[in-house]
């Protein structure tokens, strides 16, 4: 398997962090690495847990991103570090237990088959969502329908954060020019990748305690109608 790095922003995940790291490290891959990205927002023992695990395993590398302005900037900083360290495959996933480590192999398999981007879907056949408030399900599924209509895409899930990319796809993007700083980032990424060789795979999503604020919804709608115009600033000529 080509060198694969998992990028996962984490903050205040002391109750789940060790379990997630252990599950990933138990996967049967010699060339799979974990890059948890943490910032000043995290106030509990999450950083300590990661550092202790990194002392025991060279496959774990903590990235402390002091310039972070939110989870999306941590994702993008993780991508930069993964590219710098020679990753051929980059996987993005949640570090708090919402995404299941046991589903990582299907992303690797599809990249090895030649796909450029692999997107996890909660809403396609065999996908599933649990422990998520009804209004969040409606917003996610309704947001997917609206995004597909406005952007001309045809995906079952436009807002999932479990996804994977070949190195050259991320290298072609200006990672400093994404519009989104919140939930809309996933939709923005899928839109930019629509003309590459992509595929969706079913995932099981376990909801957490985070809430979705009205401001996030209005920001998402604003950005949605700017993406087509903004796209030319993303790809490096």
For the regions a protein language model found, what residue spans apply to each?
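A conserved acidic beta->alpha catalytic loop
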Residues: 39-48, 97
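Residue-level signature of catalytic and energy-coupling elements of molecular machines
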Residues: 17, 24, 78, 96, ...
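Acceptor/aglycone-binding surface of glycosyltransferases and processive sugar-polymer synthases
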Residues: 65-84, 89, 101-179, 183, ...
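Hydrophobic helical membrane-anchoring modules
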Residues: 1-3, 15, 22, 152, ...
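Short, acidic, metal-binding catalytic loop of nucleotide-sugar glycosyltransferases
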Residues: 22-32
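Acidic helix N-cap motif at the loop->helix transition within catalytic regions
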Residues: 15-19, 44-53
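Active-site beta-to-alpha loop of glycosyltransferases that engages the nucleotide-sugar donor
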Residues: 8-22, 41
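Short beta-strand/loop segment that forms part of the nucleotide-sugar
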Residues: 8, 32-42, 63, 93
């Amino acid at each position: 398997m080509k060198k694969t790095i998992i990028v996962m922003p984490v903050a205040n995940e002391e109750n789940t962090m060790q379990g997630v790291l252990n599950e990933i490290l138990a996967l049967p891959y010699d060339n799979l690495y974990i890059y948890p990205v943490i910032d000043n927002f995290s106030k509990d023992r999450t950083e300590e847990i990661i550092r202790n695990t990194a002392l025991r395993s060279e496959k774990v590398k903590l990235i402390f991103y002091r310039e972070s302005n939110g989870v999306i900037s941590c994702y993008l900083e993780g991508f930069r570090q993964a590219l710098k360290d020679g990753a051929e495959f980059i996987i993005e996933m949640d570090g708090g237990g919402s995404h299941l480590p046991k589903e990582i192999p299907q992303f690797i398999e599809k990249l090895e088959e030649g796909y450029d981007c692999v997107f996890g879907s909660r809403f396609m056949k065999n996908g599933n969502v649990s422990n998520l408030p009804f209004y969040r399900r409606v917003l996610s599924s309704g947001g997917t329908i609206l995004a597909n209509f406005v952007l001309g895409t045809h995906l079952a899930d436009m807002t999932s954060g479990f996804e994977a990319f070949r190195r050259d796809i991320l290298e072609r993007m200006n990672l400093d020019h994404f519009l989104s700083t919140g939930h809309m980032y996933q939709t923005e990424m899928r839109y930019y990748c629509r003309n590459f060789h992509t595929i969706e795979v079913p995932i099981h999503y376990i909801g957490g305690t985070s809430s979705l604020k009205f401001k996030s919804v209005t920001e998402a709608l604003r950005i949605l109608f700017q993406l087509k115009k903004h796209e030319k600033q993303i790809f490096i000529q």
